[in-house]
Amino acid sequence: MDAVSDVLRAVRLSGAVYLTGTFTAPWCVIGRTDAALCAAYLPRSERVVSYHLIIEGSCWAQLADDPDSAIHLNAGELLVVPQGETHLIGSAVDLAPTPTEVLLAGQMAVEPGEVMTVSYGGGGPTTRIVCGFLACDDTLSNPLLSSLPRLFKVDMRHDPRAAWLESSLKFAASEAASSRAGGTIVLARLSELLFVEAVRSCIEALPDHQTGWLAGVRDRYVGRALSLLHAQAVHPWTVDELARKVGLSRSALAQRFTDLLGQPPMQYLARWRMQIAAQELLAGRKSLAAVAEQIGYESEAAFSRAFRREFGMPPAGWRKSKGKMNGAAESAQAVPAASGITPPADQ
């Protein structure tokens, strides 16, 4: 399994489509990651990725705090906001924006989890968009998610695989909006595949001089090293052995790895092991000793010390604190009224 797939598996993506919209110029909407809206569609999550697939027409988008981030999108292009940050999207981004909660206020009858359909704007040229988001566990500063641009677009019609995803998502969104059985489940899986394709396209488009995790994945030698570290995280790796596996000298691999990722291979491996440990602790099915053994620690005490260095508290306390946060998130899921999706009144 390649490093991209391995990291995507670790963050446990869970996708959803919440809106199919028909917008007519002039129009502008400010999108926020609303906790109540997310709770109606997604499981509890550490991070939410927002995306918008342009089905027809065109629009502009930019981060709310960065006018220089404005990009133009045409039909067939996908807008991704990996950090779920507040962003503007519209026929122009210098218009007074309508908040998402105002736009969705008319969706009072929609049950939580169902795809909403809205029409909005001034009656000019039409733009149709499918809007969704993905929840993902981001216990550690996940190398993939933290390497992506704050806002970027991907042309979904550049190859047959991406074009198939785009057409499938359009069809599934229309089915779900018509309340066809199973439509939302299909949309969830397509959303996840859409994000994977967006990540791969982002890697392919990197300039030659780029550094960071994505550039490391693309590099012939560092990418192979990352795949080995991810696939066999429990193995007692040394830089010498890793270098032999990828076909470089020890010094050449160490330098190349550090230049691209900003840290040496063994430091990266230690952090990746803590990512695996955090995922196991969140799952709650294994003892601390079992988790320690799974990631290659010979003693629970050594594991606890390493975990504290990474997360600022021992693993038992960290798991307990995360359990409390998750319980609060699940309670919030019962009251999605802030987004305009209100629960039914008591009978």
Can you name each region flagged by the protein language model?
Residues 1-30, 124-128, 142-160, 327-346:
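A short, N-terminal "cap"/entry segment at the start of jelly-roll beta-barrel domains
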Residues 1-71, 77, 88-118, 342:
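Generic protein-terminus/edge-of-domain signal
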Residues 54, 229-232, 280-281:
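Short helix-to-turn junction characteristic of helix-turn-helix DNA-binding domains
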Residues 60, 70, 236, 268, ...:
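Residue at a beta-strand N-cap/secondary-structure junction
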Residues 74-75, 82:
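Residue-level recognition of short, solvent-exposed, well-ordered loop/turn junctions
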Residues 127-153, 157-228:
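An amphipathic alpha-helical interaction segment
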Residues 193, 197-203, 224-275, 292-317, ...:
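Basic/polar phosphate-binding segments, predominantly the helix-turn-helix DNA-binding elements
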Residues 279, 286-287, 294, 301-347:
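…primarily DNA-binding HTH/wHTH and HhH modules…
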